[in-house]
């Protein structure tokens, strides 16, 4: 699956700078050694957006309380878009007031998502528009007033990982060292023994 820099950890910058097909590693990643090949780089492949859903009677997932027609929903969506574009407007508050969607109580926040996570028309809008863009998109759920909040690049890696497990000899050596340390601390105490180590 595609990953953002934040998901990759210590070597994220190095992995993001690879050319497609290039290999990096081996490198230590937590309890694993990995070798990774960059399979694909998708600029802006993860988008953060929020929306206000204006449903209409007969739209998918519309509750029984929705009585507006499709035309009324379209007009309402463009009214909300004008309000969202107005100076001093608060998109989150508009979502709480106007949205029929499940993200209403979160101010319309959808967080980050990757290509294909949303229905096609919604997906096409957010991935083709610049950060800060506002617009109305029609889907089977109704009319969405959408704001593109942020974009992140993502990479697709093919990795081979091997868990780091100490050998029996290493485990025995650590045990012997710890036992020797314990015995040498004796009456002088832990502090003087630790300084000697």
List the predicted regions and their residue ranges.
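Well-structured core secondary-structure elements of compact alpha/beta domains
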Residues: 1-14, 35-86, 100-121, 145-184, ...
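Soluble sensory domains of the PAS superfamily and closely related sensory modules
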Residues: 15-19, 126-130
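PAS and PAS-like sensory modules
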Residues: 23-26, 134-136
């Amino acid at each position: 699956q595609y990953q953002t820099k934040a998901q990759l950890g210590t070597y994220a910058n190095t992995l993001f700078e690879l050319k497609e097909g290039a290999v990096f590693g081996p490198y230590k990643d937590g309890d694993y050694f990995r070798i990774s090949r960059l399979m694909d780089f998708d600029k802006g492949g993860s988008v953060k957006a929020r929306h206000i859903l204006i449903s209409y009677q007969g739209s998918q997932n519309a509750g029984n309380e929705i009585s507006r027609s499709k035309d009324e929903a379209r007009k309402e969506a463009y009214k909300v878009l004008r309000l969202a574009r107005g100076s001093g407007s608060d998109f989150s508050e508009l979502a709480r007031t106007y949205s029929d969607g499940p993200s209403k109580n979160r101010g319309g926040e959808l967080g980050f998502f990757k290509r294909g996570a949303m229905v096609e028309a919604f997906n096409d809008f957010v991935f083709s528009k610049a950060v800060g863009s506002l617009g109305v998109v029609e889907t089977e759920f109704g009319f969405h007033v959408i704001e593109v909040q942020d974009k992140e690049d993502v990479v697709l890696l093919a990795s081979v990982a091997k868990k780091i497990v100490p050998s029996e000899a290493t485990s025995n050596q650590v045990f012997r060292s710890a036992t020797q340390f314990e015995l040498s601390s004796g009456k002088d105490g832990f502090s003087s023994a630790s300084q000697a180590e």
